[in-house]
C-alpha cells in the first residue's frame, strides 16, 4: 500500500482519524490545518501548499481533504500546481453526506447551518469570538438571520 498523507481541516480531523483507525488504514497518516482558517479562507491555499511541500518527500501520495471552503478557487489552483488531489465541491462538509445528498439538502433548504461536533465544542472561540459577536452582538442577525 502507498504511504499516504491526508491533509484535512482541524474541524474534520477527528472524523477522518476515526475512519483511518476504524478501517485499519495504517498506511495513512492524518495531519490537519487549523480549523480557524475557515474564518480567514484566503490563507487556506498557502497553508495547504506549505503542508504539502513540508511532507512531499515522506509520502508516496498526498490527498487534501478540503473542498473550496471559501477560497474562490485558489485552493484548487494550488492543488493543481502541486499535483495533489482534493475533494472538489464547495464545502468540506459535503464529505459527510456525499456531494449529491449535500446538494439536495442545501437546494431544498438554503438556510441550512451544519453544526458538527467540532463546531459545537469550539463554538465560543470559532463563532462567538471568531466572528466578533462577543464585541459586536448586534451582528448576530446579520450573520445568522437567514438560517432556520
Regions found by a protein language model. Name each.
Residues 61-66:
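Short glycine-rich phosphate-binding loop at a beta-alpha junction
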Residues 1-24:
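N-terminal basic/disordered segments at the start of proteins
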Residues 3-8, 112-117, 148:
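Short hydrophobic beta-strand segments
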Residues 74-128:
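Long, charge-dense
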Residues 141-148:
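Conserved anion/nucleotide-ligand pocket segment
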Residues 26-44:
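A short beta-strand-loop structural module common to alpha/beta enzyme folds
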Residues 41-54:
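Glycine-rich, highly charged phosphate/nucleotide-binding loops
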Residues 126-141:
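Active-site glycine-rich loop that binds ribose-phosphate moieties when present
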Amino acid at each position: 500500500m502507498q504511504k499516504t498523507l491526508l491533509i484535512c481541516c482541524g474541524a474534520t480531523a477527528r472524523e477522518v482519524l476515526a475512519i483511518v483507525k476504524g478501517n485499519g488504514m495504517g498506511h495513512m497518516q492524518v495531519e490537519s490545518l487549523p480549523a480557524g482558517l475557515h474564518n480567514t479562507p484566503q490563507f487556506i491555499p498557502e497553508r495547504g501548499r506549505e503542508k504539502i511541500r513540508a511532507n512531499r518527500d515522506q509520502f508516496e501520495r498526498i490527498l487534501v481533504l478540503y473542498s473550496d471552503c471559501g477560497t474562490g478557487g485558489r485552493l484548487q489552483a494550488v492543488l493543481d500546481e502541486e499535483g495533489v488531489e482534493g475533494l472538489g465541491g464547495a464545502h468540506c462538509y459535503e464529505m459527510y453526506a456525499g456531494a449529491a445528498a449535500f446538494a439536495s439538502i442545501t437546494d431544498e433548504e438554503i438556510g441550512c447551518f451544519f453544526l458538527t461536533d467540532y463546531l459545537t465544542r469550539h463554538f465560543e472561540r470559532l463563532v462567538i469570538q471568531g466572528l466578533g459577536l462577543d464585541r459586536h452582538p448586534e451582528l448576530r442577525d446579520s450573520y445568522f438571520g437567514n438560517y432556520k
